[in-house]
Amino acid sequence: MPSRRLGRTGWLLGVVFASASVWLAPGLPGPASAADPAFGTPTASAEYGKGVTFEQPFTPTSEVKRVEVLVTTPGTVGPFVSSVKAPSCCQPATLTFDLLDANEHLVPNTRFTAQWRVTDADGTVRLGEPTSVLYKDTRFDWKTVAGPVVRVHWYDGPTDFGKRALDIGEKGIDDAAKLLGVTETEPVDFYIYSDEKAFYDALGPGTRENVGGEAHADIRTMFALIKPDEIDATWVSTVVPHELTHLVFDTAVKNPYHFPPRWLNEGLAVYLSEGYTDSWRSAVEDAIRGDGIIPLDGLTAQFPTTRDQFFLAYGESVSAVDYLVRTFGRDALVKLVRSYADGVTDDEAFTAGIGHDVATFQAGWLHDLGATAPAAVGPRPGPVGPLPSGWSGAPDQPTATLPGPTAPGTPSSAPTLPSSGDQVGVGLLVVLAVVLVVLGVALVRRGRSTAKPGSGDQP
């Protein structure tokens, strides 16, 4: 299962819950004679389970209008910018910015880079030197073995365990790269956990409980839950290539505009790691018999969470890729996938690869399966409410009408003005009310002037 985070981690797309502060150093020398702000050497530190801290020694020599920190991670199009309280002139200060894991989960093996930007009152903008830190899972004493592309890290099991995992990983990368016509040169880190709790802690609280492996293409890292005695199990030789295929897929389609549908990514990973097996085929056929097939446009983003629907989504995905290869050939599949690197839409990619848009491809896939497209389910108009007596059917849409003169004999819904007699009666009532109010006020004032003073009052 890939973890595709647009622009790198949720906190870069939303609000960062982080602390930003300025520490003024007491007892240091007064204002510097230099005309420009003085940036000291920036530092960055990380503590697993807590977060990342950036510090920048800084001595302003004039009024500072704004201080910002620019944070980037692998895969981002641009930096995340956060304002930090500007120090007053002209004492040495240490600017501080924290990314807290308690507020937004930080994935291990992520490198955070920060650079400080200061804007003076006159509009002059100055940049400090960038600094970076790798956020690592330091709970274990990791062992490492490396191949041409893959670096395996594990803490439980002998050296043979790591080497076996390396062989599986290198083959998975090589097979996917050959199919998609890409060359992988950047290293891929493969972290193996033997403890379930530690594994899920590393991936974060949003991880589904049925996940045994997860690839993070932005940091070119794969995490897997494999115990030493499971390394030769059949599922290991399936899960590892599956997840690593996602990393190669990302290399083939990488662009800042549009990512391919989820079913194509997962379907290709299943197709390469195990194929359209009898078990997947059986799941799809059962869904067809029960009219429970999920259209491909319902599998473009997240897959269903219930167990049966979750596995059906994978079965349908590999079924669609299998149909694509059987009908149009592997070269068409590769052309389709590689076209995404240009940032095209799904229809444009499919048209470039197989000569048909997505809807036409889906119709052909369903026909090949002997299935019918399910009825679309989505927002529907609410039921009509109770109607007034004498009404029938849906009421007409009301139109706004300004009141105006009405022809003689024509009824009007506009309010009618009171007659002259009514106006006189209303006027008398108003006068009477005013007289009563005046009399009441006079009586209250007289009562106050004749009351005896209390014991504490002065005569």
Regions found by a protein language model. Give the residues of each.
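Extracellular Ser/Thr-rich, low-complexity/disordered mucin-like segments
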Residues: 405-435
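Beta-strand-enriched, solvent-exposed domains that form extended recognition/catalytic surfaces
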Residues: 30-139
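N-terminal secretory signal peptides that target proteins for export/translocation
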Residues: 1-8
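Juxtacatalytic substrate-recognition/specificity segment
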Residues: 141-261, 290, 303, 313, ...
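C-terminal membrane-anchoring or membrane-association module
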Residues: 426-459
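Bacterial N-terminal signal peptides
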Residues: 13-27
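Acidic/His/Gly-enriched intrinsically disordered linker/tail segments
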Residues: 209-222, 234-239, 244, 251-394, ...
